[in-house]
Amino acid sequence: MPRMAATDRRAELLEAAIRVMTRDGVAKATTRAIVNEAGMPLGVFHYCFDSREQLLELVTETLTERYVAEVRGLFAPHKEIRDSVLDSLYTFWKGFEANPREHQINYELTQYALRNPGFENVARRQYEIFLGAHAALLELAADHAGIEWTVPVPVLARYVQSTLDGLNITWLVDRNSDDSRAALELLADHLLRHTTPRET
C-alpha cells in the first residue's frame, strides 16, 4: 500500500464507507468491508477513527455538506425568494433522483442506529446535522431576499426535513417524479406564506 498521510487515509476510508453503504447497505458496511474496499489493513481504520460510530456520523456530515454545497449558491442577493427556494428544492431533487441509493443511506442509517444499542447518538446527530443545514439555508434565503420568517427557523427546518423525508421515501417506493415535484412546489408555496418584508 502506498504511504499516505493520516488525513488522506481517513478521507479514503470515508469514501470507501460511502461506496460500501451505497452498494451493499449500511448493515453490511463493517469495518472489515470498509478497509477491504479501501485496500487498507484493518489496523488503519482504528488509527483513523475512534469508533465505527464516529465514522457513521462523518458519513452523514459528508453527504449533507455535498447536498448543501449544490444548493447554497442558488441563493443570490435580490433574487426572488420563491425562485431561490424552488431552485434549491429542485436541485436537491435532481440529485436525489440521479443517485437514489446514496440518499437511501440516510434512511438505512437512521433505522440501523435506532435498532442497535450504542448507536442511538448517530441517529440523533444525523438529524441535528439535517436540521442545522436546513436552518442555515432558510436564514441565507431570508438574508438575500430581505425578508423575515414569521415562524421560528428551527420549526421551519423541521417542517422541511419532515416533508422531504416523506417525499424521498415515497419516491423510493413508487418512482412518481411528477407528483413529487408538484409536492415540492407546494412546500415552497407554503413556506412563503410565512414571510414578511424585513424592516430597514
Go through each PLM region and give its residues.
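N-terminal intrinsically disordered/low-complexity leader segments
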Residues: 1-8, 196-200
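Helix-turn-helix
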Residues: 9-12, 19-54, 58
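Hydrophobic alpha-helical connector segments
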Residues: 58, 72-102, 153-160
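Amphipathic alpha-helical packing segments from all-alpha helical-bundle domains
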Residues: 98-104, 117-143
